[in-house]
Amino acid sequence: MPYYDFFWIPETETHIEEHGVSREDFENAVCDPITTDYSRSTGDPACKGLALDGRLLFCVYRFLDEMTVEPVTAYEIED
């Protein structure tokens, strides 16, 4: 399981919370992904992973460096 530092911008945190995803949910999904991919709309790295309560999330992020992730968006998806 990789470890990352997360660089949270307040607007991004508000944006993902509007989708029902907390910081902790996002970080859990990104640090322990089920699959990794890329966003079709932006080409940014993305993953499918689990929220702390078991919901399946799709998370999009950017690498600022090898260890630092900037969240972009996240939302719940169906299997």
Give, region by region, the residue ranges found by the protein language model.
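Ribonuclease/tRNase effector modules and their secretory precursors
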Residues: 1-79
